[in-house]
Each structure stands twice: as C-alpha cells, then as structure tokens.
Amino acid sequence: MMQSSISSGEAVVRLSRPQVMVAACKSRFRVLVAGRRTGKSFLCRFILYQKARQNPATVCWYVAPTYRMARQIMWKELKEHVPTHEIQKKDETDLRIELVNGSIIALRGADNPDSLRGVGLDLAVLDEVQDIDPDTWLAVLRPALADRMGRALFCGTPKGFNWFY
C-alpha cells in the first residue's frame, strides 16, 4: 500500500493513496464506500480537523447514526488528534471542540433529527451513512449546508440495497 505523509497541525499524518484521493478531492459532495477497518473514521477525523484548522470560524459536524456511536467512534481519537494549544474550549457533554481560530468541530447523532436543525454548516461528515435515515440528510443536513455552500463527506460500508447503494 502506498502512503503519503500530510501535515496535520504539528503532527505528520500518513494516509493511504485512496485516503489522499478522497481528502484532496475538490467536489462539494464526496462519497467513500469501503469495507470495515479500512481507515474511514481516521480519514473523517483528518478531514474535519483540516477544514476547521485551515478555515477560521467554520462549523464542522461529524454525524453518526446515533449520538452514542458518534462518541464511541470519534470522540477520544478526535481529542487526541487536535493539538492542545489549538483548543480554546472542549465540551465533554456536548462532544464539541472550539479551536482558537473560532472554528467548531461537533459530534452529533442522526437518531434525533430535530436536534440537528437551526445550525448553518461548513462541513458535514456522515459516517456509517448506510444506517442513517435518508430524510435526515434531505430534510435537515442538506439545508444546513445550503447558505454557506458547505461540503459533505458520506462514508460507509456496503449494506444491501439502500439509499447509500
């Protein structure tokens, strides 16, 4: 497997060639379909942090099928990935990190779509998207990206013929 090294703050992050292709893609809406244990969540974390770090005052969300899954999949690793000196505030209850540049990275669950309303987003990363109700994307998250021309990354694993197929 070919790997590339990319700077992520102070650390150098090693991404595989497919991960680099997804991270570097300029499309507004990106889709990553890959098997289990292929580094999808690692890539999600990298993309969230890069967007927030490089673009002051942006709002970036990581959305998993449930709030509990968001915490289990991403929270510990995200806190370890973001350098301490770049963190203005960390909210363990709301699963939210505010960077010194004013950007916000927050983890959310798609199991309560009404709790996702009312916020404009610059980036939405939907992980395990095959298990998220398509109406949550269409009626809630997609409109949240509209006024800011926000981007989205859909990541998931094949799971039959569903909206992610």
Listing of model-derived features with the role each one plays in the protein:
Residues 1-165:
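Phosphate/NTP-binding elements of NTP-utilizing enzymes
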